[in-house]
């Protein structure tokens, strides 16, 4: 059994190491009946959204970085063959068959033919409807746990294919560090080592209003003509310049979806303006929101900024300091 008390960062690396081992090596784990897998949040450091494709998805390019904010997913072999149970303490509204983690179990069964009962426990720390990828990350951590428990090990390519069936951004959570995603988000590659090393450990402040945003609504309000990078070659060039050191992280940071967000939610626009003018910060929306973030400059006193955010949005918001993995 893998102990649940292991540090999230340490286990996140261990889980991804195990999933890439050869099947014969994985037989050492055949006696496990329960695993606990941390599910990290992500932020979009760069997101450019292109034209809508024939399948109704937009062509996009995005740089996603994992942050030190985790849900914890416990996967246990159940007693009833073919059954799936899910428990989400404090979030009963997502403990149902629509949860992406449950959908991942169903897809995993269809691929492997394994009918073992599966009991899921998801302990949430990542806020929902935030653009932090919590639901997708939970689903992928479920898949990693299932692969650890199973005697039929799936290859990394199989895991990528299976995760893409559940959600466009799911494959990105199979990469432990920062990655570049393209297509509808399902085509991924790791960020080049030098760029990945440079951003690892970077401090960020995450802050989210008490309300969540609908991804479909934000995409529905988006106008491709407003993008600074309407062509995919422009998107790719921007990312390549950053990876090669020609562009700083701050200069890379951009999100097409911030345009409809800031038009609709003027309370975010007002706060962003004050953060830029008073504190010279570069706040961004993550994905389709509603969580926002900025890079914390080295030696910067963050407390006055936190107080400004609380004063602007109220004390019941989500706010936490974190670091990029």
Pin down the residues of each PLM region:
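Glycine-rich beta-strand-to-loop/alpha-helix junction loops that act as flexible
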Residues: 134-135, 285-290
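ATP-binding N-lobe of GHMP and related small-molecule kinases
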Residues: 18, 26-130, 148-157, 182, ...
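Short hydrophobic/aromatic beta-strand micro-patches
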Residues: 293-295
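DPxDG-like acidic metal-binding loop motif
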Residues: 130-156, 172-174
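Conserved, helical-rich catalytic subdomain that frames metal- and/or nucleotide-binding sites
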Residues: 175, 180-282, 297-300, 307-310, ...
